[in-house]
Amino acid sequence: MSIFDRLSRLLRANVNDMISKAEDPAKIIDQALRDMRSAYADARNEVAGAMAQAAKLEREAGTNSKLAAEYEKKAEEALRGGSEDLAREALRRAQNHKDLAKGFDEQRTVQQSTVDQLKTQLRALEAKIDEMESKKTLLAARQKTAQAGETLDRVSGFSKAGGAMDAFNEMEQKVAGMEDRNKAMGELRNDQDFDAQLKDLGRDKDVDDALAALKAKVQSSNQ
């Protein structure tokens, strides 16, 4: 778990504990800032350690690359001197150091990526601390304003009137609902009457068609 994950859990635990105890919001902010500053110091140490590890890996990669080059040179010298076995052993060692250099360099790349991420998170944490510092004064002013509003609410009796207003609004909504229902039922009845008229028109047409057919039949039989 990174230092930033630990910070997040620590802040949530401390803030939730203070909220559950109904602590002053200003105290909660102060405690959060203290936790964040402490975590920031730990995070800087963690980033420094990661950077040191990246530098060490780079150093190891360079050392092994240098040794590989030296053994290749020795292999060439041995071969020129007529010692093929010695040249082969030197090349084997050169290859071993090449493999090590490659491995250290790959690890350095991974470590450097971690360092970059940690630096980004560290800067974000620093910016968040600055933001909370700047908002601290504003929060205190907002708290005083809110407290003044609560005091005014208590002494003016608006808190008591609020209950009556809520009851009135609830009743108004109920009446409006009844009116809407009555209106909907009226529209539904009108729709049903219209459908009935259409149905009657259909029946009248059927009767007219039957009458016309009967007339035609009668006329045909009289001829």
Curated annotation (Swiss-Prot):
Top-level taxon of the source organism: Bacteria
Key word Translocase present: no
Coiled coil regions in record: 29-185
UniProt key word Coiled coil: yes
Disulfide bonds: none
Record family assignment: Belongs to the PspA/Vipp/IM30 family.
Protein name: Phage shock protein A homolog
